[in-house]
Amino acid sequence: MFVARSIAADHKDLIHDVSYDFHGRRMATCSSDQSVKVWDKSDNGEWNCTASWKTHSGSVWRVTWAHPEFGQVLASCSFDRTAAVWEEIVGESNDKQRGLSHWIKRTTLVDSRTSVTDVKFAPKHMGLMLTTCSADGVVRIYEAPDVMNLSQWSLQHEISCKLSCSCISWNPSSSRAHSPMIAVGSDDSNTAYSGKVQIYEYVENTRKYAKVETLMTVTDPVHDIAFAPNLGRSFHVLAIATKDVRIFKLIPMRKESSSSGPTKLEVQLQAQFDGHNSQVWRVSWNITSTLLASSGDDGCVRLWKANYMDNWKCTGILRGDGSPVNGAAGQAGTPGAAGTPGGPASQNALQAVAGRKKAQLMPG
């Protein structure tokens, strides 16, 4: 059962992204009004805006939290061609704001010559690393060598993807059997260029990222991409938001002992859903990777789950105002797909409906 609650976000323009922190007790929103807002959940379940500030000189496309072991740290990216890192600090005893927290900019990353379209922190086992992608087709990976000094970031890798980039996702697996892997989606509207999703893997011998796979069947613009939590699986699961929702299974092939190159992947399409009957803008997994949420231009959030027969189907539809759509269950995905059956989502799911200035909150 999902209960929706509207939040008067008070943004002056479209909300482009909403992001929970690790514990689900804080969230951040960003907007074309060039601002980021931070929200804290009170004990009675209400969300209160505890910080709001102008972050960029253009639309802010994405905002994301670092793992809390690195402190209260946010990153944002913008049409103004920059990404920024923000840290919350608490006033010192001799400070006029003693005991009060406020957010300060630690650094601005200015390497991109075009709009920075996505920003993501790497999985925490890799250290404090930040990845950006931009409309000129370049993915950049930065590292903070000293986690106590977030004003210093060094550019570690640049990956040229040829196509304009719209979204990135790190494979969260911390297994030593899996090298660091990142998926990149493109919103290039030219369907003559097939393969709008590219997978890159870190190669230890060369100390560089190499392309291991291009998903050639994805020919339409990709708006979002999300690796599922790994949970010890030997394979990877990747969800893609394009003109529909797709779930791919990426199976690493056994390496030859003499091979020093990137891992070869066997790609299987697990499921494909056109239930939105429109462009899909966001996909998000629950923490156990048993439930996938998607939001689209139909103004609905749809929930997808694999049953005990490993077939994916729609288990719920919520309108932009949070009200359920009758007859939601039973919309199956094609083809039949392997997945991990499990209980309902154990995390909150939050979607910002495109074109709205309110965030819709749907705890479950």
UniProtKB/Swiss-Prot annotation:
One of its GO terms (molecular function) is structural molecule activity. The GATOR2 complex is negatively regulated by the upstream amino acid sensors CASTOR1 and SESN2, which sequester the GATOR2 complex in absence of amino acids. In the presence of abundant amino acids, GATOR2 is released from CASTOR1 and SESN2 and activated. It holds the Pfam family WD40. Keywords: Cell cycle, Cell division, Centromere, Chromosome, Chromosome partition, Kinetochore, Lysosome, Membrane, Mitosis, mRNA transport, Nuclear pore complex, Nucleus, Protein transport, Repeat, Translocation, Transport, WD repeat. One of its GO terms (biological process) is cellular response to amino acid starvation. Component of the Nup107-160 subcomplex of the nuclear pore complex (NPC). The Nup107-160 subcomplex is required for the assembly of a functional NPC. The Nup107-160 subcomplex is also required for normal kinetochore microtubule attachment, mitotic progression and chromosome segregation. This subunit plays a role in recruitment of the Nup107-160 subcomplex to the kinetochore. This is Nucleoporin SEH1.
